Amino acid sequence: MQFLENLIQSISAHILPTACIACQRFQDESICTSCLNTLENNSLIYYECCYQCGIPLQVQELPNKQCSYCKQCSPLFDETYCLDRYDGILQTALHQLKYQKRIAFVHGLAKAWNHIQSAQLVSDDADYILPVPLSPEKLLTRGFNQSWEIARRIRLNMHTHKSPFILKRHHHSNHQAGSNMVTRQVAIREMFYIDAQYNKSLQGKSVIIFDDVMTSGATLNEIARILKTIGVERVINWVLLRTTRFI
């Protein structure tokens, strides 16, 4: 299946014009060199960010490499790595992928991650990478899970298993934009679960959770909670776009 997909992509690249997902200029690649350079120069990876939630740190927070929120509230995930700010050059492309079903854009988004983040994170010894799941209703409506479509194209160590079937979501919740962290955490409680057949194989393991957007961190914290409940040792978040303040 992957071979067939790569073949189709290769043929299409020689037949159809390609526009950069960020600047929309026609060229040969899904994201152009200029936009990759812009992204790399402004990527959150080069900023002093909270090791736990990935948000840029205030001056007074720099010594501990942890933001005041994480220090006070102690999220259950262990680390977070983010590619760029939510309001950066990839925001429009991500919106078009999700809401206009521009599925071809996953190639450019994955390429951006691989170009900038994979070299930094290639030594991560995680056992699994799991996408944040959509509800069955949302998956049926959209037709794909954007987090999985990006995650499965990310370069990883050979022993890291990718799967969209282990972590699942019960049902769709109302959009939580505008709600504070406490309200979001309550609304999403018990929303996710692990397919029971994988419980034993996850015990004592290190798991990466991939999400397209991180705002308050409530979703990722709830996922970390259920993973650690069944015995996962370490939970790391990989996030495409991060809001730079809590919403």
Task: State where each predicted segment sits.
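Glycine-rich phosphate/pyrophosphate-handling loop used in enzymes and phosphotransfer proteins
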Residues: 1-247
